[in-house]
Amino acid sequence: MHSQHQPATLQEEMERPERYDDLLQCCLPNYAIFFGTVAEYLPAGEVDILELGSGTGWLTRTLREANPDAHVTAIDRSPAMIALARRKPELGAVTFLEADIRAPWPGGAFDIIAATMVLFGLSIPEQEEILRRSAATLRPGGRLIVGDAFLPESPWEEGIYRAHWREYMIESGVDREEADAMIASRDDILHQIPTLAVFRDMLKDAGFSRVLVPYWYELYAVVVAFI
């Protein structure tokens, strides 16, 4: 008997570089505001930016548009994602490096370190190490900009926000079963997603002196930490 081919899940589809950009818009509420807020906190001029987990270059493009004079170094562990990003003509001036962000970063100091939808996939100790290394790598006056998923303060809030998230995905064209599977996958990593209050403390412990949260919508937020 021939086995039937099982269609790829939404999460598996998001691992495919050619599908990632489209699916990101379907799964991340207010994605334009989310990434735009990251860009709003870039200083002007010839600054050096290190992007962690750059993927297909969605944020990379936003950074370049916000500050064309910036020198951007982007790290991602997926050669396929980097290959797709390199094919985007607007990212021709970006230096792409294939590496795991937990491995040593390129030498030198940076003015900005940016990471979106990356840290939630790491354990809390790994996140703490990334924050410490960021603080040590940034120049005086530098800042770390993180856009990521965060844990609400109560299960009651989590439930309400999940319902809104599901509604958004379905309205964006995601199949109901796939939306449910995406939401259920959050349970697998819930133990390593900090609340914003805990993340603030993690940043302070890592060596950052001041922290802003300029954007926060339900399960997602943008955090800016200053040296």
Question: Would you name each region that the model predicts?
Answer:
Residues 114-115:
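A conserved beta-strand element that flanks and buttresses the S-adenosyl-L-methionine
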Residues 5-7, 14-32:
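Class I SAM-dependent methyltransferase Rossmann-like catalytic core
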Residues 50, 56-103:
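Class I SAM-dependent methyltransferase SAM/SAH-binding core
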Residues 29-45:
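Conserved alpha-helix/loop element of class I SAM-dependent methyltransferases that forms part
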Residues 149-204:
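C-terminal alpha-helical "lid/dimerization" subdomain adjacent to the S-adenosyl-L-methionine
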Residues 128-140:
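A short glycine-rich, Lys/Arg-flanked "PGG" loop and its adjoining helix->strand segment in the class I
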Residues 209-227:
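Core SAM-dependent methyltransferase catalytic element
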Residues 142-149:
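Conserved beta-strand signature within the Rossmann-like core of class I S-adenosyl-L-methionine
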